[in-house]
Amino acid sequence: MGEGEENGNEADSNERSLALSPTWSVAIVLTVFVVVSLIVERSIYRLSTWLRKTKRKPMFAALEKMKEELMLLGFISLLLTATSSTIANICVPSSFYNDRFLPCTRSEIQEELESGSTVKRNLLTKSLFFNIFRRRLDVIKRTTCSEGHEPFVSYEGLEQLHRFIFIMAVTHVTYSCLTMLLAIVKIHSWRIWEDVARLDRHDCLTAVAREKIFRRQTTFVQYHTSAPLAKNRILIWVTCFFRQFGRSVDRSDYLTLRKGFIVNHHLTLKYDFHSYMIRSMEEEFQRIVGVSGPLWGFVVAFMLFNIKGSNLYFWIAIIPVTLVLLVGAKLQHVIATLALENAGLTEYPSGVKLRPRDELFWFNKPELLLSLIHFILFQNSFELASFFWFWWQFGYSSCFLKNHYLVYFRLLLGFAGQFLCSYSTLPLYALVTQMGTNYKAALIPQRIRETIRGWGKATRRKRRHGLYGDDSTVRTETSTIASLEEYDHQVLDVTETSFEQQRKQQEQGTTELELQPIQPRNDCVPNDTSSRVGTPLLRPWLSISSPTTTIELRSEPMETLSRSSSLPSEKRV
């Protein structure tokens, strides 16, 4: 009897409610939770304030998306806590619970209960959490299901799912921050190449020297300048595949792609391509930090098909590494293709300069690679979160982690794939995807984009309030002059147009926005072999239209500028 009473008192102490708990213990626990929550909240607030002050709007948007993700996971957690007792009291016939859709067999669970394998966990875990299998037996007493029926999901199962959501949130946010940090560090290491390239901003080099620099390609191209291996497609892919494990981008690659981008979009040689690339990557980063609906669907599908004998965790560890290698090889292949075309080793009639185009990418969509990178990063964080969850909730020797060598292999693949994707693939993507047909929205200074958005909002607001008909046009009696060269020092000079220009605008029903370059000083005298001097930033005219507003960007009518995918389609009123 004494031993039975002692066990009963121990069980009662484990299940003690707040009414029987000392007030000091409750106050201490509450204080710890409040202090930790306030520290996290204030840290996020100060980070948001710093991003706003430094005008890093893309990074601020990415942080807001991470906060939305945490809020969503917090809402799911709160919903599970509030409805756990109700769900646990939903009873279904025991015949529905067969061994077909179980991740572990009942015999394995029984062996773990008998051997007490979970008791071998470290002292910290035992002191912080109740024994998981012992509580599983205690929960049976709480259910109200009759004989022959079982809870739809047990109370303990809902608690375990609750903890998985918490681990998933922490792991995904941590992986996202590390990914951006490693990518920024890698891209900033290219800054010295940008500074060297801008030494020729006055366009003073001779044609022979410039042609030598322009044709100075990667070691890959230099190795394949002799036929017939230069046109061997299989050898090119094999070389690109192995090159991503070393120095994925060297100086000649960067200078060549930079020159190709500047020439293709008619920018001056002094344009800061490196800063534009960082702005572009920051804007795209907000697309890879969140968890979209399809990714949540992947989590649900994994929970459904993770049955005994499927080895699903092994396959989900293989998928992200495979995708990282494929994406990295494809990006290297784009560089190799452009370099070979420039060296005259392919049949593509590219002439003497690079021809960036969407056809170089899969399905003519460079943005498809970003979606794959998003899936890779989420998959890696999900793999690590699953490991921590299994080890925390079921023990290191449970049926989920029984094969230790396979667990080590999965973790090694996950860390290697994450590092390769963050430090090599993502920076390479930021550079190579600039070789698409269209430039990205980051090329346009922020103030001009805000001005265009403001006009669009004003138009929609006036139409919504019926201030003018559908055939009306929003007119601005000013001309905006800006330079794309100095992003951090943008100047919007507003000048009045002449009466004749106003009359023409009213007749044509258009609003004109002129982008004129700041003429650079020519500190050297051009000779017969030097190329053009003082090339304007935007040569062709570009029209941005909507059903009610037409905006024209005009400069010298020389070549046709490719339309950015971020701009609406052209439509004349």
Curated annotation (Swiss-Prot):
Segments on the Cytoplasmic face: 41-69, 185-287, 330-371, 433-573
Superkingdom of the organism of origin: Eukaryota
Extracellular side: 1-19, 91-163, 393-411
Low complexity: compositionally biased ranges: 507-516
Region (Calmodulin-binding): 446-467
UniProt biased composition (Polar residues): 561-573
Gene Ontology molecular functions: calmodulin binding
GO biological process, one term: defense response
Assigned keywords, A-Z: Calmodulin-binding, Membrane, Pathogenesis-related protein, Plant defense, Transmembrane, Transmembrane helix
Pfam families documented for this protein: Mlo
Start and end residues of each stretch annotated as Disordered: 500-532, 554-573
Cellular localisation: Membrane
Family per record: Belongs to the MLO family.
Protein name per Swiss-Prot or TrEMBL: MLO-like protein 11
Gene transcribed to yield this protein: MLO11
